[in-house]
């Protein structure tokens, strides 16, 4: 396949990912209302898992092809890129996004991200010989167990919080009462639950197919350009696979579901590192010990960015400019992180 055709297919996959992300946001919003999941759990499970389908496709395809550096780079680099989606969401919010969240549950979600990404770093320090059955890294299993426990904790706290938080001026959206946005109708309000679920499933299939196209064409373009697999996974592929989070995050903010916008990002980041377990099984060897210092650097940057926004929810600072202070700080850290990645590579 010629380079222009590869580029065209790559861009087509990116566009399909974006459009599917918009539909995922709308259908998840509608399913949350119909099924009563509540905002944070919906963002953590439904939209997070569906939004991670490109990463699922890329991880499976890369592991089958033995491109383990690309698989690891996309999973870890995606955390950095997707956290920066909160900067984009901040641009569309009337006040700083972390000011509007008005709940400590996203703080729990942020802490969950920090813990599972820390396990990624620990897994990278283990030798490949330390593996269950010679195939699976103990860290990969620990990540899945911690993520599952985190889901349970978030749900229990959401249903029966031991504390009451009063944040004046907050406009979280669901589950307490939807923030009213003039002239913005609720998505799929007149459709049946079965119809909404079908549209959700179709959007998931499109997202998954687009992820396969992105991996195949992205890998081909990288080979021709001589780009390192980690750098490719952490930059162009991570940006392309973050398109569902960008589209769904903007849509959530537009609908007034500010907690969902944050829950989408934190939930997706926490879930996608669970994909190291299937990557181990498919590759037949632990992937994390092969991640290298570039991925360790990216994971560290991801932890710092997550901590910035987690603290921002508690501090609730007003914006000095078009962006909140946490988003401004995140931009600085991101720029330094990319500069460091280029330097290390």
Predicted regions: what is each one?
Residues 1-345:
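Hydrophobic alpha-helical segments, chiefly the membrane-spanning helices
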């Amino acid at each position: 396949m010629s380079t222009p055709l590869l580029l065209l297919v790559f861009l087509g996959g990116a566009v399909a990912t974006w459009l599917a992300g918009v539909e995922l946001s709308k259908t998840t919003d509608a399913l949350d209302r119909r099924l009563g999941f509540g905002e944070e759990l919906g963002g953590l499970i439904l939209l997070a898992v569906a939004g991670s389908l490109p990463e699922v496709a890329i991880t499976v395809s890369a592991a089958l092809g033995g491109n383990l550096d690309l698989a690891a780079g996309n999973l870890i680099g995606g955390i950095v890129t997707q956290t920066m989606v909160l900067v984009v969401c901040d641009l569309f919010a009337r006040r700083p996004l972390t000011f509007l969240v008005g709940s400590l549950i996203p703080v729990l979600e942020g802490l969950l991200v920090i813990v599972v990404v820390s396990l990624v770093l620990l897994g990278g320090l283990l030798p490949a010989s330390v593996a269950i059955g010679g195939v699976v890294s103990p860290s990969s299993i620990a990540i899945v167990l911690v993520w599952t426990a985190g889901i349970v904790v978030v749900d229990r706290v959401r249903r029966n919080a031991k504390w009451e938080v009063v944040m004046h001026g907050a406009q979280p959206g669901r589950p307490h009462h939807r923030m009213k946005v003039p002239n913005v109708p609720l998505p799929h309000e007149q459709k049946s639950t079965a119809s909404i679920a079908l549209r959700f499933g179709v959007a998931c299939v499109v997202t998954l197919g687009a992820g396969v196209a992105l991996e195949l064409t992205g890998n081909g373009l990288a080979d021709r350009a001589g780009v390192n697999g980690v750098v490719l996974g952490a930059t162009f592929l991570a940006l392309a696979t973050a398109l569902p989070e960008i589209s769904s995050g903007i849509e959530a903010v537009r609908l007034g579901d500010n907690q969902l916008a944050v829950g989408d990002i934190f939930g997706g980041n926490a879930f996608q590192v669970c994909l190291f377990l299937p990557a181990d099984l498919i590759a037949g060897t632990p992937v994390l010990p092969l991640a290298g210092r570039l991925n360790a650097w990216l994971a560290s940057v991801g932890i710092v960015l997550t901590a910035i926004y987690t603290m921002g929810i508690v501090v609730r600072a007003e914006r000095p400019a078009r962006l909140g202070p946490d988003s401004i700080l995140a931009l600085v850290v991101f720029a330094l992180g990319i500069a460091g990645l280029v330097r290390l590579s």
